[in-house]
Amino acid sequence: MKKELQGALVLVSVSLGNFGDLTARARHLLEYCDILIGEEFRTTSTLLKSLSISKQFLLCNEHTTPEEIRSLGQIVVDSGLTVLVSDAGTPGIEDPGRELVGEVLRRGGRVQSAPGPIAFGAALSISGFKTSPFTFCGFLSRDSSERKLELSRYLKPGHTVVFYETPYRYKAVLRDLDSVLIETGEDRAIFFCLDLTLDSEFQFRGKLGELLKVLDTLPKGNPVIVVSQRKEQRSQRSFSKGDKKPSFKRFKK
């Protein structure tokens, strides 16, 4: 397999948090690649350590300059097999890896995928909502006013909507979403999850107003937010979470 991928950039999906979800092909590529490019030093080091792989690697993240991206692109096309991983899930989706992909393609290099977990797909699949059509919005603006405008625009077609947010901003975003839904007179159901695949995973399905009642009690975590299609409603509230947070005993698993 390595010979067949000489000179290629392979985007390798890693787990969303549970290392048990890593595929055998991903392990093989991580172990035998000539060049490895990660997103953050600590996360990539932890991944390699969990696999008992000792390997040096380069970084491509939000701090990587355009000049450094060009340099990495040249390294890829001049090397053997290069693997790109992100901190979680599939690289190239809402992370700086997409810039490297574009650079490699501009230089005539090959880009291939070793697919696996992806957070928005996992959340959408367990939401219970209709999945066709859906709109993936990535991360919204940091500014509340701009964010509300974005939410209004994404919700207008009536599709199922999926977006990411940071652990530090998701509570403000959910409150903005509530304001937009009230302003537009829509009563759409949501699916909200934190820390997918981990023991601390938290899920909520139902009306956003019900989630807001307990929002301040929720911990920091990596969220995915799914809004149902316009005609799809859920009147029944449903919470679920892992066993390691006894303070949430009232939430049903």
Swiss-Prot record:
Subcellular location: Cytoplasm
EC number: 2.1.1.198
Region (Disordered), start-end ranges: 230-253
Keywords, in A-Z order: Cytoplasm, Methyltransferase, rRNA processing, S-adenosyl-L-methionine, Transferase
Transmembrane segments: none
Molecular function terms from GO: rRNA (cytosine-2'-O-)-methyltransferase activity
Segments of skewed composition (Basic and acidic residues): 230-246
EC primary class: transferase
GO cellular component: cytoplasm
Catalytic activity: cytidine(1402) in 16S rRNA + S-adenosyl-L-methionine = 2'-O-methylcytidine(1402) in 16S rRNA + S-adenosyl-L-homocysteine + H(+)
Superkingdom of source: Bacteria
PANTHER family: RIBOSOMAL RNA SMALL SUBUNIT METHYLTRANSFERASE I
Family statement: Belongs to the methyltransferase superfamily. RsmI family.
HAMAP family xrefs: 16SrRNA_methyltr_I
Annotated function: Catalyzes the 2'-O-methylation of the ribose of cytidine 1402 (C1402) in 16S rRNA.
Protein name in the entry: Ribosomal RNA small subunit methyltransferase I
